[in-house]
Amino acid sequence: MAQIGVSAMKRIEDLLDIGSFVEIGSYISSRNTDFNLSDKDTPKDGVWTGYGTINDSLVYVYSQDSSVLGGSIGEMHAKKIVALYDMAMKMGAPVIGLIDCAGLRLEESFDALDAFGKIYLAQTKASGVIPQIQAVFGLSGGGMAISNGLSDFVFMEQDKAKVFVNSPNAIAGNSQDKNDFSSAKFQSESTALVDFIGTETEIISGIRELISVLPANNEDDMSYIECSDDLNRTTPELIDRISDPALAMNTISDSGYVLEVKKNYAREMFTGFIRLNGNTVGVVANRRVLYDEKGEIAQEFENVLSHQGSDKAAGFVDFCDAFNIPMLTLVDVKGYRATKCSEKRMPKSGAGLTFAYANATVPKVSLIVGDAYGSAALSMNSKSIGADIVFAWESAKMGMMNASEAVKIIYSKEIDSSDDIKSTLDEKTKEYENLQNSVVYAARRGYVDDIITVADTRKRLIAAFEMLFTKKEDRPYKKHGTI
């Protein structure tokens, strides 16, 4: 058996600033049950709880100890976590959970079940008030996986961590060897749960970085650091990097800082954080190309909205709005993904994305860098659904649909009766593009605020967000939306 508490405590020590951890509830152990848990050594009831600092910022942390009853959730275990949440809510500071949990403690039956519910309630109350981060280092099974889903960001150790509601071996016709859907790879690529995977060291470093870009709570000023980059720096190289927003953001952001979120899931949609003039800004962007670390093309995408990408973006917009983080949207979309699976999910997912943007009251700036066609473009933070500022590059194309497709419908009879179909099609396409798909036309109608050059992108975005810094927007009273 592993030495009690060593891994759980070491993770806390590695995570927090040196010497800053103060433990709370160190004398608590499990309560006696019909199964005589009093005969077992259950120090801290399997979870360390306390507070400390990350880069001098207050955080609350709990770390489950798998050497004590498998780190399972029991009455007193949960009581410690809920008490930690209560304190974090009073102080307006993030809660970080270091997860290594076998799930529900069977020996405690209803008391353990009630304990899980109280953790869920504490997380629900904290949602949108303080950031909630969990990192899974071992098991996170059954009800603990639901707790993962109630968090804002989830990290997962790449080799040993397992997240599941039902074990892969419990699914009819499946086994862990056949399809291990509890693995970090599956959870990060096929679900919308996991934001980051890596080694223990990478996860600890990643949490510290994430804390540095997030506000402490929903009333905190935007996370700010001193900007040493040139606010008027030109960005002509953006034109060659825009197909992969990760590279584009590296060009636009202060000193090239980019933190991509959920980067393994729905890769056709980029979500992440950058800094502009020292302030944290959330970014959503359509992606056409994914480059690997060597700068070679790893994957290409059609510039369409998928239901996975829409859900990913909507969740990110909701988080940024809850914590007053300004939003930048880079638009390059020509429509919706045309598959049977997409048709099953796209109406609801598209509505979710549209609602998230329309409902958000933080500063919202859009930049049209490629295509912006139809209702798919409307959903990507268009002027029509509440964008504060919409910029477009001179090369961008906007409209109801692609010009070549539009003229086939509008001028179908004229094209079919033409002696030279190709010439007629080309002529009508050019005419339609100049009249209806021009960013100049869109700007004249007020759907675009300004047409900017690629080189001026960074400084124009910074100026727009600076102007919007004190934005306040009143909405009709309602308890909450229903989308």
What are these regions (language model features)?
Residues 1-483:
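Ligand-binding clefts of soluble mixed alpha/beta catalytic domains
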